[in-house]
Amino acid sequence: MMRRLMTIVIMLLMLSSCYYFNQVVDDIRDSNAMERGRKKDGGGAYENDKYKEGVYKAIDDIVKRPVNKKIQFEGTELIIPENTVINPDSWTLLDLKTGYGLPISFSTQGLCLNKTVKGKVYSLWYNKVMSGVNEIGKKIEKVNGFTYTCK
């Protein structure tokens, strides 16, 4: 009887704090975000074995393209490589020829590469380890006037 009573008390304490429930919900949300990123049009597509080879071929192709396409992003004009767009769901660069997402993303939250337009901060992030992505990112950074603000 005492064991059951203690079990009930412990369960009530766990349920009343909601910590474990919130932890499970957060884990599910994080897992879903990671899975969305690894889809073909997500910024993490290169991590998916199914798309890895195609993503690297797309990167090699995009490196050769000029960075001259003007697009609107959250109230400002950005210049990105030809035949690419910013994926409206993940804000990552998307190749229109192949449909592959690249590990280059844009944000309205301050990161290290920032550009301020009319008091609003825009950020650029790209995978600096991947050689082709690093080249594309540096071109976008230079053309759009992003500045490195981290120390």
Where are these regions (language model features)?
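A short acidic-to-branched-hydrophobic micro-motif
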Residues: 94-128
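N-terminal targeting sequences that direct proteins away from the cytosol to non-cytosolic compartments
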Residues: 19-100, 125-151
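Sec-dependent bacterial lipoprotein signal peptides
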Residues: 1-20
